[in-house]
Amino acid sequence: MKSFTTSFTTGLKSLLRRIEMKRRKFIISAASTIPAITLFPSDLSGITRETVRGKLEKRSLGKTGEMLSVIGFGGIVVMNATPDDASARVRMAIDAGVNYFDVAPSYGDAEIKLGPALEPFRKDIFLACKTTERTKEGSRRELEQSLKNMRTEHFDLYQHHAVTTLEDVDTLLGPGGAMETFLEARKEGKIRFIGFSAHSVEAAMALMERFEFDTILFPFNYATWNAGNFGPQVMARAKEKNMGILALKAMAKGPWPDGADRSAFPKCWYEPLITEEDITMGLRFTLSHPVTAAIPPGDEKLFKQALSLAHNLKPLDQKEVNSIREKALKGVPLFKS
């Protein structure tokens, strides 16, 4: 557990350094001309919603025709769990109405634990996976291994994982790049939809300009949005293209302060929101935008809180929007544009 956590945290810190070190002016007119999405009270235009008493709300996923639960299950929740615990956590999520599960090879043993636990429910859920491999050969190898680990013949969504720089974009979309695997696998029936996750505005905007993706997985968070101007331009473009919008970091407070005790949340490389009031605020902010689903942190306790609180979310009114903005401006956002 300790060695993986150290490696996981180190890798994410490295990713953030790359964003800062390689950030450069991004000359795509859309990035500078698309305005931020107006802050509601509620901006869910274009989203179809389904509600069933006692279950999580479901929302439409862009142009895919799929309906996903507003809370997704991140594979890190079962990382290092026993098989019995993994099955229990999956069952808990299913019983709450979760039908969206997301995993990646970089999440330690999560695939190996999640695959058997999900097998009885496979036909009823939407399964997403990702690869950090940028080449055709590497991504094909990782795709086939992930399918084997997850005990499935196909993924509903396969994503380019953590795309950070324009060099990443050029490589994965270029000759011999990972996109060649994605397109071949879609023809083979091994993946249904193609998406990406990103942690930089420039990479996200570049990808959306150069390929017709089905989905985007991106940090849409009250603090990064208001204090970092990180997210509005990406969401506006994704909505314009009728992409399925999936959210990371809805429950992030910001970077861990220097010297902070992180022992209570070893799977969180950022400081999470932990009180019921703050978690509710974070989820309400993110899900009041045209977001289909939010993936909570991989910590089991926080995931359970998200499941509980997401059943009773109400739209934000303008007074609350203003209050959240003031709160965000007092803190340090996890990402900045």
Feature locations, PLM:
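Active-site groove signature of glycoside hydrolases
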Residues: 150-168
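N-terminal binding-site loop/beta-alpha segment at the start of enzyme catalytic domains
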Residues: 12-125, 187
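Conserved, mostly hydrophobic/aromatic
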Residues: 61, 73, 101, 114, ...
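Active-site mouth loops of central-metabolism enzymes
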Residues: 74-84, 130-137, 266-274
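Conserved beta-strand positions in the central sheet of alpha/beta enzyme cores
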Residues: 72, 102, 156-159, 195, ...
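Short, acidic/polar
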Residues: 80-93, 136-150, 199-206, 279-282
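Acidic-and-aromatic substrate-binding clefts and catalytic sites of carbohydrate-active enzymes
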Residues: 79-83, 104-112, 132-139, 166, ...
